[in-house]
Amino acid sequence: FTKDDLFIKRLIGKPWGQDIAALSNMAEGFLNVSQSGERSDKPLLHVSKAVELALHYKVNPYKKDLSKVRTLGYHGYYLEHLNTILGCYALAGGTGYEETHSRVSEHLVKISLEEGNAHARLIPYVKMRWAADQAAIINSLWLYDQAAGGNLHSEPSERWQSYMHQNCKHATGLFQTEVMNCKKYSKQPRGCSMAYLIHYCSSFSPDLAKQQWSLFKEHMHHRSFGFWGFREYLKGYKGGMNPDSGPVLFGLGVAASGLAMKAAASTGDVDVFERLHKSARPLLATAEGLKAVPVINLVSLVATDMLSTSIQFSAITKLAGLQQGGRSISSRKVSHSLV
């Protein structure tokens, strides 16, 4: 991945995780397409490529073939997304990675349950642990169970939900962002984190996802200058932008609003999805047009790089699939176009 693929590489020489996260979102999107009823082998081919790239030594933190890695260690962030990709590949009909899929899944269970707070360590020597990442880990285990017929996700899910309800609820009822309390914002619900958490919870705990989604809309859904989005921080809390949030404009978070499209699709909220999509389309079209303009193109790349477009792709294909299946979705159609 180059700086033309991922905006963050223009700011940080060796960022962690944006490459595997982009591949994970792509894999989810192509799984959505494969389950839409379209008779084509293209989705599986695309997910297969995502697996290949995810295992590549330039993406995986071990810098060598995983079969030659004796212990997977505490690379929870990479492994949560790799396991998601492997789950999507298996559910799309792919074979050949069963041993790796089983190994990664069992390791994620181990490093989750060995912690008193039920949150696996995400990066060696980094204390911070986001609740959304543990939800992603459990979702990846749920995908594994769907493919392999097991029940690995149940205990990590029960332990995590119990811990969050007892220890990590903000006064709004929303879950806090970071559970080790090592950041100023740790006890705050953040938009980018909440949207991801809700999306991942929708698989293994749909009722919890809908409950948090309702609170998320109540406290952080906001309209500014005619555009609908989601706040990165609660009104009144002074927090800045960072690589996770992307730009925060007039209170609205770029990452929070983009990821909220996934959360809306995953919870079947077509009205909010279409509201966000309608607001995003002219902004994305403008950003695409500015990619050729020096200096200004740095801003446009935030919304048009591989991570951003993969998130949009995953959200749009998710909602389109639910509409086709008639699962609590109106008959209104959403375009598959990313812009």
Per-range role (PLM):
Residues 18-32, 74-90, 129-146, 185-204, ...:
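Well-ordered alpha-helical segments within folded domains of soluble proteins
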Residues 22, 31-135, 317:
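Extended ligand-binding groove/face enriched in aromatic
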Residues 2-19, 209-339:
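CBM-like carbohydrate-recognition segments
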Residues 30-48, 89-103, 145-158, 201-217, ...:
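Structural helix-adjacent loops and short alpha-helical linkers that scaffold large soluble proteins
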Residues 1-41:
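N-terminal mature-domain "stem" immediately C-terminal to a signal peptide or N-terminal signal-anchor/transmembrane
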Residues 5-7, 52-68, 114-122, 168-183, ...:
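Acidic/His metal-coordination segments adjacent to aromatic residues that form catalytic metal sites
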Residues 99, 127-255, 268:
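Extended ligand-binding clefts on enzyme/binding-domain cores
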Residues 54, 58, 112-115, 164-168, ...:
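Alpha-helical junction/boundary sensor with strong preference for TPR arrays
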